[in-house]
Regions:
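Low-complexity, serine/threonine/proline-enriched polar segments
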Residues: 133-177, 329-370
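Iron-sulfur (Fe-S) cluster-binding segments and ferredoxin-like electron-carrier domains
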Residues: 2-9, 49-61, 116-122
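Leucine-rich repeat
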Residues: 176-182, 207-213, 237-241
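Conserved C-terminal portion of the radical SAM core fold
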Residues: 221, 243-252, 267-425, 429
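Membrane-interface junctions of multi-pass transporters
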Residues: 2-48
């Protein structure tokens, strides 16, 4: 299994230099005859993505790192040293530290986001926008014992039961101290939320790095929705000039009304305004990084075109959504998937996802029910938007709940007649609905 190491019992330096887990992986990757026992566990997401789509975060990271000859040489030097000594030691400024320790505070309600990553998602779920069928199998994400089984509503008082794995305040301070101890070896720090730019606590780390004269050597990366740039008295633009480089990796997988629907509470004009403001600084890059889901894939080519047409965006990248399974690209109706294939002729990984068969048990009617529940929740607010207005091509596949039993029974009879038996033995899936 995976190791029992966490921030409570293992420092960053111990994890990188002395950790048996990391050293096992290093040894396997340098052994051509290895069975890759540990690597298969640690890298299972990338292995799965490469098998399904021919592309993963691993392949993207290798491409980015190898394009920087100085950084790539550092990596090669460390590999050679480990081969000679069997030990990894921090000697060069080449480490990336990823910090997901500042909580789940977020200002958006993105339909595909796991609830443990967003305080707004938790609030909206607690007020009734929830689906056991879509999210119920992800036990770390469920508000345990809080859903009223008759109404399907999560009780507000129990919102704290959402499991998010964040560490407490004392450990946040400890993480700052640990980060400062290895600061001379840090090439980049990636801050992950929630929405990091509105998390006040992370600015304490930035202040410490500036005061220690380390900031000028370090790249700061944000996985951000880029809708807000201030948190209380903190303004990210006051900190930017002190760092070697600041990379704003904006979560953008739709343009205009599309992203405003999928990532509810987004203001597209504000995202662009903040992007333009970021580019006033010579040491800021803005990248778009999208999550390709069954909704976004219907318009994601617009994001690609936008980036190609607008030089304020440095690069675009994307990942294919894996969970919740119902939201995967391959679970769209076949008619829509076939129609989208020509739009992604230059993007074989997205085409590969579109060509995959539907996952067993994935039912687009459950997706419709969940999304329409969200539409109802936002009716009358400034974030009001409706699924079939934004994605009208989906409406023909929607079956009203009161009509589904008749459709289900009809399909069972057709199947029974086809195989020459008197009683249907095949149950309807979402294929029956599309």
């Amino acid at each position: 299994g995976l190791p029992n190491h966490n921030v409570n019992n293992t420092s960053l330096k111990e994890w990188m230099e002395d950790g048996e887990y990391m050293n096992n992986i290093r040894n396997e990757m340098l052994d051509a005859d290895s069975d890759f026992e540990f690597t298969k566990k640690a890298c299972k997401r990338c292995i799965a993505d490469e098998r399904r789509y021919g592309r993963s975060r691993r392949t993207a990271s290798i491409k980015i790192a190898s394009n920087d000859s100085t950084y790539w040489q550092m990596i090669e030097d460390e590999v050679k040293m480990f081969q000679m000594t069997g030990q990894f030691q921090m000697e060069q400024r080449m480490i990336e530290v990823q910090l997901k320790v500042y909580g789940d505070e977020c200002n958006l309600d993105c339909f595909m986001c796991m609830h443990d990553n967003s305080s707004i998602r938790q609030k909206v779920a607690s007020e009734g926008v929830w689906s056991d069928e879509v999210f119920g199998s992800y036990s770390w994400n469920v508000p345990v014992d809080t859903i009223d089984k008759q109404t399907g509503v999560v009780k507000k008082a129990n919102m704290k039961n959402f499991k998010n794995g964040n560490i407490d305040g004392n450990n946040v301070e400890d993480m700052i101290e640990q980060t400062m101890k290895i600061a001379p070896y840090i090439r980049s720090i990636k801050i992950i939320g929630g929405e990091p730019l509105i998390m006040k606590k992370h600015y304490e780390l930035l202040k410490r790095l500036i005061a220690a004269d380390q900031a000028q050597h370090i790249i700061i990366k944000y996985q951000t929705n880029l809708t807000e740039t201030k948190a209380g008295n903190h303004n990210i633009f006051d900190y930017i000039p002190h760092f070697k480089l600041v990379c704003m990796v904006a979560s953008v997988d739709g343009v205009g009304k599309t992203i405003e629907y999928m990532r509810r509470r987004t203001d597209w004009d504000k995202v662009i305004k903040n992007t333009e403001y970021c580019r006033r600084y010579d040491n800021v890059n803005v990248d778009f990084n999208g999550l390709v889901s069954l909704l976004s894939v219907m318009r994601f080519y617009e994001v690609i075109d936008y980036c190609l047409d607008n030089p304020i965006i440095d690069q675009i990248n994307w990942a294919l959504l894996e969970t919740p399974i119902n939201f995967r690209v391959n679970n769209l109706p076949e008619k829509i998937k076939k129609g989208l294939l020509p739009k992604y002729e230059l993007w074989p990984d997205i085409q590969a996802a579109l060509k995959l068969p539907q996952d067993p048990g994935a039912d687009i009617q459950e997706v419709f029910d969940y999304l329409l529940k969200g539409d109802e929740y936002y009716t009358g607010t400034r974030w009001e938007s409706h699924l079939f207005d934004i994605f009208p091509e989906l409406e023909e596949f929607y079956i009203k709940p009161e009509d589904r039993d008749r459709k289900h029974q009809k399909n069972k009879k057709v199947v029974a007649a086809h195989i020459g038996i008197n009683k249907a033995t095949t149950f309807a899936t979402s294929d029956d609905y599309v």
